[in-house]
C-alpha cells in the first residue's frame, strides 16, 4: 500500500460529495481513508494504482463511479516547439519529456505525487526519475539529455551558489542518497539547455534555476530511466493527472542522436484487452451481459466496445495496472461494489484424503520394514563436510557448525548413523525416508525439494547382492520392473555400484561403499547402501494410474 496525504476540502470540492460517500467509494477502489486533522486526510492506496496518487487522479476515478463521466478521460493536447535530444547515456539510456500548460495544482501535492511515483514505479529512482520544471524559467526550446563530467557546475535546488557535480554528491542530501545510482566513469547524466546550462542531473537533483513556486502553472517534465516502458508509463501518468487539473498537454519532439530516430512524447500508451463474458460470470459468480460488463468498464474510466460478440476494452495510458483479462474483471467487481457481490449457495460434501506422495512414502516405509530394515530419522540439516556433492544449500548464520548445510542426499546421514552404532549387534539394517534439497538450474532459486528413501546394511561381510535383492523386491512391489546399469561415483567401489533405471529414467543409486568413504566416517566394517528417488518414482507411478 502507498499512503498519501490530501486536503479533504479541496478533494471533496472537485467531486461535490460528502466525506462518508468519499470513503465508501474509495473502499470500492481498495483504498482506505483515515482522518489526520480537521483539514487533512490520509489515504492508503494499492501500489499498482499509480493513477490514484494525486487528488486529480482520485477525482477522475470517483467521477466514473458516480457516472458523472464515463469511459476514457479526454484531454487537450497540442504540439510545441520543444525538442529533447537524447544522447548516449550509458547508465540511464532512456528519456522522454512533455510540457503541460495552465495546470492548477497544489505545489505540495505535486511534489508528493512525484515522490510517490519515485518510490513505486521508479524503484526509489533506480528505474525511473522525474524532473518537473517551471516552464517559464526554461530559456531554450532545445533540451539535450547527455553525459557531462563531474566538474560541471550549476546551482542545485535550494542552494544559492554554484557547485560541481562532485561537490553535490559530497555535500547535499540528495547527492548522498542517489549519487551512486547513475554516476559512472567520471560522468553523470544531465538535462541541459542548448546554451549548456544544466536543468537537472537525474536521478539526483534539479537546478534551482527552474525551481517550482506557488505561481507555477506551466511545466516542463522530463522522465529518465533504465526501462523505456516504465519511462513512458510514468510520463503518461503525470501529464494525465496534470491535465485532469485543467492543464493542456504539450507534445515534445524526442530525437535519438545515436540512430536518428524520432518520436513525439508523451506516447499515450494504450492497449486492447479482450474480455470473455463467461469468464466474468465464472470469476465473479454473477449473472450479467456484455452490455452490463461494458457499462462497468466505462465507470472505471476505460472505453469498451462489443465487436462481433467480443468485448474489447481500451485501456488508457493512466491505467498501467491493467495487464490482462483478470485485471479488467477486478475492475468490474470494484464498479459493482464488493459488498454487492453475494456468495452463491453451494452445497457439497467432500471428504479429505491423503496426498498421493504421502501414501507412496508410507508404502515404501512398510516395504522397508517388511524387508527386515529398521527405520531411523535424521535431521534435514547436516554438517557440510559430510556431504559428497559441493552443490548444496549453505546456512548463512548457523547456530552450530554441526548443522550448517541442508542435506542433498540421505546417504551421509545413514553413514553417520552406522559410524555411531558399530558396537551394535550385526548385521545392522536401517533405512530412512525424508526430504532433501538438490541442485536444479531450471528453478528460480537453483534448488528444489526432493523426496528420497535410503537403505544401508553393515556387517562383517556384506556385498552388492545383499542390498540389491531387497531393493529389487521393494521396487517390484510398487509395480516397477527396473534395470541396473553400472555407474561409478566417489561414494561406491568402482565396478560394484550401479544406477537404477526405469524406462531410461534414473530412479536411484546402489552399491558397496568405498573404503575411503568408510575411513572418512570412521567406519571399520564394510557397508552397502541404496538410495531411491521417491519423487521420480511417484511421477512414473502416477503416469501408470
From Swiss-Prot:
EC class of the enzyme, as a word: ligase
GO biological process: phenylalanyl-tRNA aminoacylation
Keywords: Aminoacyl-tRNA synthetase, ATP-binding, Cytoplasm, Ligase, Magnesium, Metal-binding, Nucleotide-binding, Protein biosynthesis
Gene Ontology molecular function, alphabetical: ATP binding; magnesium ion binding; phenylalanine-tRNA ligase activity; RNA binding
GO CC terms, sorted: phenylalanine-tRNA ligase complex
InterPro entries named in the record: aa-tRNA-synth_II/BPL/LPL, B3/B4_tRNA-bd, DNA-bd_dom_put_sf, Phe-tRNA-ligase_IIc_bsu, Phe-tRNA-synth_IIc_bsu_arc_euk, Phe-tRNA_synthase-like_B3/B4, Phe_tRNA_ligase_beta2_arc, PheRS_beta_core
Protein name, per record: Phenylalanine--tRNA ligase beta subunit
Pfam families from the UniProt entry: B5, tRNA_synthFbeta
Taxonomy, superkingdom: Archaea
Binding annotation for Mg(2+): 321, 327, 330-331
Cellular location(s): Cytoplasm
Cofactors: Mg(2+)
Residue ranges occupied by any B5 domain in the UniProt entry: 268-343
Species of origin: Saccharolobus islandicus (strain M.14.25 / Kamchatka #1) (Sulfolobus islandicus)
